[in-house]
A protein has these predicted regions:
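Terminal peptide-recognition signature
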Residues: 41, 67-68, 82, 181, ...
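TOPRIM fold recognition
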Residues: 1-16, 73-76, 275-276, 284-396
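N-terminal structured subdomain of primase-like DNA metabolism proteins
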Residues: 1-121, 190, 388-396
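A short, highly charged nucleic-acid-interacting micro-segment common to nuclease
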Residues: 10, 157-178, 209-216
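Short, basic/aromatic recognition patches
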Residues: 187-216
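Amphipathic alpha-helical segments that form well-ordered structural scaffolds
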Residues: 20, 176-187, 233, 289
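Conserved active-site segments centered on acidic
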Residues: 95-168
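Phosphate-handling DNA/RNA-contact segment within nucleic-acid enzymes
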Residues: 206-314
């Protein structure tokens, strides 16, 4: 009996990996129904977001595990996972199984030890229809669970907001946050305009949850995360005695009120000025450091991923991207992705990196490090920077 060739089966599989996964790897069904989004790792108990299939999974069949098989950020494809789990004996065996499932034409030589029979067109269509039906059921269940999750997220956000007070240096109750700023080299924020803190709040005695249980109560800097001109979530930094709290995750983003995957998510730190120039950075402390160094409003994208997706308001004409300098170059690459996106939208954009070298033994350096080491002299001269950008805008 002839076998399936690699070229024939791979060509047939492209565009059908959703059905293939549903048939041979049903544990991936939730992830397959939500391509590109983090879901619990199907092989690691307690994981909440340790796995995802890539957005083009149906075409390429690739996925990524945060932790799997002794590796970090392990990228695998359907074929490797079938082999790892023992669903197939080897790659050729997987080709036989998938080729039969897809009803591929046998054009190669017989492979010793395999005995799968090709299925006819009718059986192929029935199998694919059944797989699609199963995937649709999983997707419907996932959507329902997601709606419930967002509903709970909204309730928790409202409860947290009710515990907060507006952040202002005039209110002595906010001292724990300004003590934290002082320890991060941001003491000059005591003299910043009130508009800078419009979306920042202070929360006393904030419960900290670990694995669903309250393990302590801390002061917290609470920041409103916006998406599509709406409150999407809250970002919290838990504090103790002017430092980050001694917990496993001192920074946490609460379960959001809605999806927000197709929109930009960020923390506003100041209003857009009339000249339309703002900055964007990853972390809150980094963004506030850039404000101290340049006097421009610099917003926080929270993470490198959100930085790539940042879309400024319509009245923004130019954006300075204050990137982190990482050994892995994640920060630099994300900043460059954003710069190109903004240019395509007709928005002037530049990437600005710290000049200091990454210290030995460190993973990277950011603009807060630069501020602590060099003060405002570690930043581009504000007047020259403004003149440079306005000149570029006039030549548009």
């Amino acid at each position: 009996m002839q076998s399936f060739t690699k070229e024939v089966v791979l060509a047939a599989a492209s565009g059908h990996y959703n059905e293939i996964a549903t048939r041979f790897l049903p544990m991936l069904s939730l992830a397959v129904s939500r391509p590109g989004r983090h879901v619990p790792d199907p092989f690691r108990a307690g994981s909440k977001d340790g796995f995802r299939v890539f957005k083009d999974f149906n075409i390429k069949g690739k996925m990524i595990f945060n932790q799997a098989f002794g590796e970090t950020n392990k990228v695998m494809d359907v074929w490797e996972l079938m082999d790892t789990l023992g669903i197939s004996k080897n790659f050729n065996d997987a080709l036989e199984q998938v080729g039969s499932f897809l009803g591929c034409e046998r054009t190669g030589f017989h492979i010793k030890g395999t005995s799968y029979q090709p299925i006819d067109k009718k059986r192929q269509e029935e199998a694919l229809a059944a797989a699609k039906q199963a995937a649709a059921k999983v997707e419907a269940e996932a959507k329902k669970a997601e709606e419930e999750r967002y509903s709970k997220g909204e309730a928790a956000i409202q409860k947290q907001l009710a515990m907060t007070i507006p952040l202002t240096v005039k209110d002595p109750r906010c001292k724990p946050v300004f003590d934290y700023f002082e320890n991060r080299g941001l003491g000059m924020l005591k003299y910043a305009p009130e508009s800078l803190f419009k979306d920042l709040r202070y929360s006393p005695r904030t419960p900290y949850f670990e694995n669903g249980k309250v393990t302590g109560y801390y002061d917290a800097l609470v920041s409103i995360v916006h998406s599509n001109n709406k409150v999407w979530s809250l970002h919290r930094i838990f504090l103790l005695n002017g430092q980050k709290a001694p917990v496993s995750s001192a920074k946490k983003v609460m379960t959001p009120k809605f999806d927000g995957k197709d929109t930009s998510r960020f923390i506003r730190l100041g209003d857009v000025p009339e000249h339309g120039i703002i900055g964007i950075a990853e972390g809150i402390e980094t963004a506030l450091s850039c404000f101290c160094g340049t006097r421009l409003p610099v917003w926080s994208a929270i993470s490198a991923t959100f930085l790539e997706e940042f879309t400024p308001p319509k009245n923004v004409k130019a954006v300075i991207i204050f990137a982190d300098k990482d050994k892995s170059e994640v920060g630099q690459k994300s900043a460059e992705i954003l710069r190109k996106r903004l240019l395509e939208k007709g928005i002037k954009a530049w990437v600005c990196l710290p000049k200091s070298e990454i210290p030995q033994g460190s993973h990277g350096i950011d603009w807060n490090d630069e501020l602590k080491q060099k003060g405002v002299f570690g930043f581009p001269d504000p007047i020259k920077l403004f003149e440079f950008i306005t000149d570029k805008l006039q030549k548009k």
